[in-house]
Amino acid sequence: MWMLAALLLLVPRSGKAATLEKPVLTLHPPWTTIFKGERVTLRCDGYHPLLLELRPISTLWYLGHVLLPSHKKSIEVQAPGVYRCQTRGAPVSDPIHLSVSNDWLILQVPYAAVFEGEPLVMRCRGWYDKVVYKLHYYHDGQAVRYFHSSTNYTVLQARASDSGHYQCSGTMRIPVESAPMFSSKVAVTVQELFQTPVLRTLSPQEARGRVVLRCETRLHPQKRDTPLQFAFYKYSRPVRRFDWGAEYTVPESEVEELESYWCEAATTSRSVRKRSPWLQLPGRGPVLDLASTTAPVAQAAALGPGDKPLSFRKTPVSRSVQSVTSIPNSTFAGLQFPAGHVATAGPHACAPLPASAEQSREALQPKVDLLLREMQLLKGLLSRVVLGLKDPQALHELTETPETPNSHVTVNPATPETTVMEGRVDS
């Protein structure tokens, strides 16, 4: 009867067997590297059902693929390897890698995963706690911190860029001060707390006829209870500051500029902040975004608490070419622009020119022709002045030929005719 009651505790109302979460394996002290001869304690925390057995087995321990003889909740170990545990009816726990060293100097890092925004603590430890002097910490071969004697190195708010290989060096007095000694390199990985957010529009059914934007992201499974806040921006202007809601309703007056929106997700302490790419509407290609040329959106790098993103975003202009329009210009006629691509300082195209503009263009044509002829004469004059400076004798010979252009030009503004006055350049 009691056995039946115990089994019923594991069967929910749906009739399906309950799925138990895997147990949590912890290490004390919390360092993955120890000196030879030292011992550490492993503890397995999980669900332990009350089974009516004479000798209930509540915990299983594994070293690699070998089953250890102990069935206690905690065990002491000193052998290197990969440890796991399992409770009755639950999956196997995540592993803990334990290293044992016989060096004079070891670098100890936490066994548990370190997530973005959390402190990352490392300890450079001398043989059986001897004091380490002239202590240096290295990240991927570069010195990042110096201490006079034994001190932990702490990164207050870890970032993905803090991942890599760490090492330490220093001296010890055994009994006199030794030469600098180096620890082995240790790999450290900073886990992503949540993914880079993506801004999307809700379907008309979900939005109930409105235009609603949703900032979507996903937390790491081990941190799924971490609260996040969201902010929405239009260009670089915040339209809704950080709040718990992941949705924002766009005003009707701004619906035409949806592609200028982006969002940001952050923890409540703002220790981790990540911005989304610009909103991409279905069926449209990438929008002109000058900011992305200097900082690719793919990284969507996490912003610091004080960072203010800038935007140089412009409204896109259609690239379809249907016809060619001739646009008059006060300084040069005949400039050709594809229809819809007339010169403009704003995002909207100019309106078609009226018939009076065409008449104005015809009136300006003689003046433009006159200006072109004057420019040709001035070009010839300047070329001869330059030739005279370089070779006066050659210029003297050219001025005696009947084809020599005149060097003095006057223009009668009343007519489009050009009056030429004879003259010559003295060599």
Curated annotation (Swiss-Prot):
Disulfide bonds join 44-85, 124-168. GO terms for cellular component: cytoplasm; endoplasmic reticulum. Glycans are attached at residue 152. InterPro entries: Ig-like_dom (IPR007110), Ig-like_dom_sf (IPR036179), Ig-like_fold (IPR013783), Ig_Fc_receptor (IPR050488), Ig_sub (IPR003599). It is found in: Cytoplasm; Endoplasmic reticulum. GO terms for biological process: negative regulation of immune response. It comes from Mus musculus. Expressed at low levels. Expressed in B-lymphocytes. Detected in spleen, lymph node, kidney, lung and brain. Residues 401-427 are annotated as: Disordered. Induction: Up-regulated upon cell cycle arrest. CDD domains: Ig2_FcgammaR_like. Keywords: Cytoplasm, Disulfide bond, Endoplasmic reticulum, Glycoprotein, Immunoglobulin domain, Repeat, Signal. The keyword Glycoprotein applies. Residues 401-418 have a biased composition (Polar residues). This is Fc receptor-like B. Residues 23-101, 103-189 form the Ig-like C2-type domain. The keyword RNA-binding does not apply. The lineage of its organism: Eukaryota, Metazoa, Chordata, Craniata, Vertebrata. Pfam families: Ig_2.
